[in-house]
A protein has these predicted regions:
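N-terminal "domain-start" segment that seeds a small globular fold
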Residues: 27, 31, 38-80
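Short pre-active-site segment immediately N-terminal to redox-active cysteine/selenocysteine motifs
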Residues: 86-88, 92-96, 128, 166
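Sec-dependent N-terminal signal peptides
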Residues: 1-23
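Conserved redox-active cysteine motifs that mediate thiol-disulfide chemistry
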Residues: 92-109
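Thiol-based oxidoreductase modules, predominantly thioredoxin-like and allied folds used
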Residues: 118-133, 145-154
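Thiol-/selenol-based redox modules, centered on thioredoxin-like
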Residues: 169-206
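Short, internal strand/loop/helix patches
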Residues: 137-169, 173-175
Length: 206
């Protein structure tokens, strides 16, 4: 008769030992999440509904920049100097930039409005073709972007943005090579209007 209580005691001790071990296994903290990816070197400006913010622009395009070869996307390489005597619209963008994607349709409408005029529309991505080539190609398959497209190397991006590390940015250059307008960000309903006004100003500038 004495063996029965002893067996019950052993069973109870075993249960007490197993339950906390089992609990520890269930509540063991999960592994920490993977490290967040490194952010792109330029930051997308948030979308707004007021006029785009003007930037302090360079007075003229430097000679070194105009003569600098630009690696084209899907076409022959070119230089800004190739379009001397024409109005230049230069848009800096990236495939990961949401405001850039939403800005493109407005700019495309403007480009079509000035078809046949002495206006050249150039879109330069700030991404690195060695690492981002496939992503940029996928982006361009999803959007209608009729600009002459190319890759802005670090020196060109730094000079065109005048040191401000944000995109999208847009510059309008008159036929004499003077930058008459420069702004960053995408403003819903405003960016296209502002671009139209800047181009008209550049075309009529004496």
């Amino acid at each position: 008769m004495r063996r029965i209580p002893l067996l019950f005691l052993l069973a109870a001790l075993t249960a007490i030992n197993v339950i906390p071990q089992s609990g520890r296994r269930i509540t063991q903290p999960a592994s920490p999440p993977p490290t967040a990816p490194i952010q792109p070197p330029l930051n997308p400006q948030p979308e707004v509904r007021s006029a785009p913010r003007p930037l302090t622009a360079l007075m003229t395009l430097p000679e070194s920049l105009r003569e600098r070869p630009i690696k084209a996307i899907g076409a022959d390489n070119f230089r800004l100097a190739d379009f001397e005597g024409k109005v230049l619209v230069i848009n800096l963008w990236a495939s990961w930039c949401g405001p850039c994607r939403r800005e493109i349709p407005e700019y495309e409408r403007v480009r079509k409005e000035f078809a046949g005029k002495d206006v050249v529309f150039i879109g330069l991505t700030t991404e690195d073709p060695r690492y981002e080539g496939e992503r940029v190609q996928r982006f361009l398959r999803d959007v209608s972007f009729g600009f002459r497209l190319g890759w802005a190397d670090n020196e060109m991006a730094r000079t065109l943005t005048n040191g401000r590390r944000s995109i999208p940015q847009t510059l309008v250059v008159n036929p004499e090579g003077r930058i008459i307008s420069h702004w960053d960000g995408y403003a819903v309903g405003w960016s296209g209007k502002r671009l139209t006004q800047a181009i008209e100003q550049a075309l009529t500038r004496e």
